[in-house]
UniProtKB/Swiss-Prot annotation:
GO cellular component term, pick one: cytosol
Similarity field: Belongs to the SecA family.
Name of the featured protein: Protein translocase subunit SecA
Region forming the signal peptide: none
Membrane topology qualifier: Peripheral membrane protein
Residues at which ATP binds: 83, 101-105, 491
GO terms (BP aspect): intracellular protein transmembrane transport; protein import; protein targeting; protein transport by the Sec complex
Superkingdom classification of source: Bacteria
InterPro entries (UniProt xref): Helicase_ATP-bd, P-loop_NTPase, SecA, SecA_CS, SecA_DEAD, SecA_motor_DEAD, SecA_preprotein_X-link_dom, SecA_SF2_C
Organism: Thermosynechococcus vestitus (strain NIES-2133 / IAM M-273 / BP-1)
Localization per Swiss-Prot or TrEMBL: Cell inner membrane; Cellular thylakoid membrane; Cytoplasm
Catalytic activity: ATP + H2O + cellular proteinSide 1 = ADP + phosphate + cellular proteinSide 2
Enzyme Commission code(s) on record: 7.4.2.8
Length: 929
């Protein structure tokens, strides 16, 4: 109704971009007339105009026209009008929803080029290394042609290479690499180790998968902490000897223990130490954990012992949580109590969620085939609008209504017979399954029906094999079973993907002769596993096999084509030597050879000539087959279960009917499917029973379809609430993380940190005064002796300070006096240190500040984790757990900042360097502190 009154809001948004499209199209002729070098000179001209005060929006029409022309010359691909609109949506920092096959990858070149003109860097994020590499090589050619630098981040890269790649105008990377690099940069001990520049603009491909499906996944860098095993064992022994209510009290509600004075005396006597809190030999932490293990953690209630390991039991579900460990040394204390082998503690050194990582970008945009269903979440959490880009040609896909069966068995038999029926007509079929086990079950049924098919699931076949299967999934009579449509990077082209087939044929001849044996590959020597499993990659200890499945190719290549191919391989071997290149480098050469970018390299040119010839021969067959398949009705997609999110169902449907091709989809469901069982089961089951239907009879009823959609909405809302909660809690951590990382970066970059340390020292003096002097009490009740002792504990150089020096001063005067004293002492300390080695004091300042920030931040992360766990229970006490978490988390953070200050001041005054070691050793020798 509202749509009829006001028009579709999405259409209004898209309409807004129309005048710009007209403007770009008017520029087309003019830009086409430019020579290559004139076109390339445009980049410098645009940069100049930005310097002269024009904005990116002013440049947009001309810049887009230039990219469109460059892409036409280099890749032979010209942006459609709808792709220009997609580019504008991305430039405006929104999410562009574009259907499968509408060329998302090409769209990103437009805003990436425009935003890279500022020189601040653009990140294009994909979901896996293979897609990042493919896009950097393929689309990167347009940017390189226009004079921009293009970087690529891959899993095994060394820091120097990463630094170089991040310094480029446009960098392609995966979400996890960007996240881990961000965390590592914030653990660096000098600016030389920092690889990333400040974030500027980011385009996320498959944005729903990164910002929604993986939003709850934290990225964690952790380190093993070596702690002395014998301390845990000794502490367990002491805890056994201490008596409850005499030596300690147990607070069951807070799950904590408090030691009495008698307890401290007894424990110190048993251990033969004078102070449990002695920083040189700390025992308190171990003793407290040992008492907790004895009193609060019971075997077979809180944990079980299985195969010599302590396994946690979840108190809410009663399930064992394999692989989870209590933190803070508690797990070790329980291992000691049970007399088991004590394992190392692991400690979180740094962590961030994708939600917060991407919110660090001043401007963020994304593309996907399916975002509209999650629009509310994108807007609420990421402030990102979703705009649907119209398709270039109207869709001809038919979505048939769902068919529901009573049992799972009946459903699978129906799926198999549908495959057989459609296969008999010659139409290609794609079946999406939700698990490996189900895909193998269907494969078995199809084998019994003698239907040839390809199986694609998460078994360790590598990405290349996956893309190979998808590349031929559109051929006449092809049947493909795929789990969760993992190969989202390659399009299903009706009649077969000639381009991809030709590339695989070149690969068969080229790779065996040029790739070095695995034992010589530098990646292997470094002990780095290549991130590709078996299949066509190396599986451990196996011989590499480059041959594609023989059925893949549509026809034999001609003698002339084979001659060209053998010649190209000979040229490569002559240039580089037999079996001399690492696999990645050879893959890169192949990728560049199969694109259209101009090249000077004779090897690539020879490979390209062969590739083009083979592709042309294959195209004769695939084009004819394309027409046949279109006439038959295109690809038929079968879904075998509804996913937890409608979005993933839509991704599967979107495989059919791409770019205006015909196609159809249908979902087969059963009452035993997870989604229906968990979220809608009883209501639907009662409908079914009321209908008294045989199990092999399908049901199609509007009532049932509605119940299904409600079940799906329920699941979506449930997961959205979880993500929102994770986000709200993590928001607290995020503000703290930003503050501490900003402080850390200031220290890393700061040339002169002396003023900062003096400020720390003055604040520490103020803290000491506040602890010993209550301005509301008369001066004779002030504990000046304690105050002076505490000051001298921090600053031994003030040994001459006496209580009488402070006796007649007011609090502000006392502060001013101690500020002056501590400054003088610091100058004195500096003179001592500089006499040993000039410049050493500055290094020491940086080292101690970074060391304390890192050390206390790690501990703070653990405290925040513990707080988050305990705060959940406050809900029962009518308190809002989130409000409590924010309040207490903030207090913990302030405490940490104070501790950092005090420890730095203490460490610097205590610092006694040995006689002139080389400067590097100063920082590494105290690294453990």
């Amino acid at each position: 109704m509202l749509k009829a009154l006001f028009g579709d809001p999405n259409q209004r948004k898209v309409k807004k971009y129309q005048p710009l499209v007209v403007e770009i199209n008017l520029l087309e002729e003019q830009v086409q007339a430019l020579s290559d070098s004139e076109l390339q000179a445009k980049t410098a001209e645009f940069r100049q105009r930005l310097d002269n005060g024009e904005t990116l929006d002013d440049l947009l029409p001309e810049a887009f026209a230039v990219v469109r022309e460059a892409s036409r010359r280099v890749l032979g691909m010209r942006h459609f009008d709808v792709q220009l609109i997609g580019g504008m949506i991305l430039h405006d920092g929104q999410i562009a929803e574009m259907k499968t096959g509408e060329g998302k990858t090409l769209v990103a070149t437009l805003p990436a080029y425009l935003n890279a003109l500022t020189g601040k860097g653009v990140h294009i994020v994909t979901v896996n290394d293979y897609l990042a590499r493919r896009d950097a090589e393929w689309m990167g050619q347009v940017h390189r042609f226009l004079g921009l630098t293009v970087g690529l981040i891959q899993q095994q890269m060394a820091p120097q290479e990463r630094q170089k790649s991040y310094a480029c105008d446009i960098t392609y990377a995966t979400n996890s690499e960007i996240g881990f690099d961000y965390l590592r940069d914030n653990m660096a001990t000098s600016m030389v180790e920092v690889v990333q520049r400040p974030f500027n603009y980011c385009i996320i491909d498959e944005v729903d998968s990164v910002l929604i499906d993986e939003a709850r996944t934290p990225l964690i860098i952790s380190g093993q902490v070596e702690r002395p095993t014998e301390k845990y064992l000794k502490a367990a022994e002491i805890a056994r000897l201490l008596k409850k209510d005499e030596h300690y009290e147990v607070d069951e509600k807070a799950r904590n223990v408090l030691m009495t004075d008698e307890g401290f005396i007894e424990a110190e006597k048993l251990l033969g130490v004078s102070d449990l809190y002695d920083p040189q030999d700390p025992w308190a932490h171990y003793i407290f954990n040992a008492i907790k293990a004895k009193e609060l953690f019971q075997r077979d209630v809180n944990y079980i012992v299985r195969n010599g390991e302590v396994v946690i039991v979840d108190e809410f579900t009663g399930r064992v949580m394999v692989g989870r460990r209590w933190s803070d040394g508690l797990h070790q204390a329980i291992e000691a109590k049970e007399g088991l082998e004590i394992q190392n503690e692991s400690q979180t050194l740094a962590t961030i969620t994708y939600q917060n990582l991407f919110l660090l970008y001043p401007k963020l945009a994304g593309m996907t085939g399916t975002a509209k269903t999650e629009e509310a979440e994108f807007e609420k959490i990421y402030k990102l609008e979703v705009t649907v880009v119209p398709t270039n040609r109207p869709s001809q896909r038919r979505d048939f209504p769902d068919v529901v069966y009573k049992t799972e068995r009946a459903k699978w038999l129906a799926v198999a017979s549908e495959c057989a029926e459609v296969h008999a007509t010659g139409r290609p079929v794609l079946v999406g399954t939700t698990s490996v086990e189900k895909s193998e079950l269907l494969s078995q049924l199809l084998r019994e029906l003698e239907i040839p098919h390809n199986l694609l699931n998460a078994k360790p076949e590598n990405v290349e094999r996956e893309a190979e299967i998808i590349a031929q999934a559109g051929r006449k009579g092809a049947v493909t079973i795929s789990t969760n449509m993992a190969g989202r990077g390659t399009d299903i082209i009706l009649g077969g993907n000639a381009d991809y087939m030709a590339r695989l044929k070149v690969r068969e001849y080229f790779m065996p002769r040029i790739v070095m044996p695995p034992s010589d590959d530098p990646m292997m020597l470094l002990g780095l596993k290549m991130d590709r499993g078996g299949g066509q990659g190396f599986s451990q200890g196996a011989q590499k096999n480059w041959k594609a499945s023989p059925g893949l190719f549509p026809c034999e290549m001609s003698k002339e084509a084979e001659k060209l191919l053998r010649h190209a391989v000979d040229v490569a071997v002559k240039t580089y030597g037999e079996r001399s290149l690492p696999e990645l480098q050879a893959e890169d050469m192949l990728a560049i050879a199969s694109e259209k970018a101009p090249t000077e390299d004779p090897v690539i040119q020879a490979l390209r000539d062969a590739f083009n010839r083979i592709r042309e021969e294959y195209e004769v067959v695939t084009k004819k087959e394309h027409e046949e398949v279109v006439a038959l009705g295109g690809l038929h997609v079968i879904g075998t279960e509804r996913h937890e999110s409608r979005r993933i169902d839509n991704q599967l449907r979107g495989r059919a009917g791409r770019q205006g091709d015909p196609g159809s989809t249908r979902f087969f469901l059963s009452l035993e499917d997870n989604l229906l069982r968990i979220f809608g089961g009883d209501r639907i089951a009662s409908i079914m029973n009321a209908m008294r239907i045989d199990e092999d009879m399908p049901i199609e009823s509007p009532l049932l379809t509605r119940s299904l959609e409600n079940a799906q909405r329920k699941v979506e809302t449930y997961y959205y609430d979880i993500r929102k909660q994770v986000f709200e809690y993590d928001e607290v951590m995020n503000n703290q993380r930003r503050a501490i990382y900003a402080e850390r970066r200031r220290v890393l970059e700061g040339e002169d940190l002396k003023d900062r340390v003096l400020e720390y020292a003055e604040k520490t003096m103020d803290d000491i005064i506040a602890a010993y002097v209550n301005p509301d009490l008369p001066p004779e009740e002030w504990d000046l002796e304690g105050l002076v002792a505490k000051v001298q504990e921090f600053v031994y150089l003030l040994a001459d300070l006496r209580p009488e020096h402070l006796a007649h001063l007011s609090v502000p005067e006392m502060q001013a006096f101690l500020h002056e004293q501590v400054r003088t002492a610091y100058e004195q300390k500096e003179a001592q240190i500089e006499a040993i080695q000039p410049g050493l004091m500055r290094q020491a300042e940086r080292f101690f500040i970074l060391q304390q920030i890192d050390l206390l931040w790690r501990e703070h992360l653990q405290q925040m984790d513990a707080l988050r766990e305990s705060v959940g229970l406050r809900g029962y006490g009518q308190e809002d757990p989130l409000v409590e978490y924010k309040r207490e988390g903030y207090e913990l953070f302030l405490d940490m900042m104070v501790m950092i200050r005090r420890n730095v001041v203490y460490s610097l005054f205590q610092f006694q360097p040995q006689v002139a070691p080389p400067p590097e050793q100063v920082s590494s020798s105290s690294e453990q502190g």
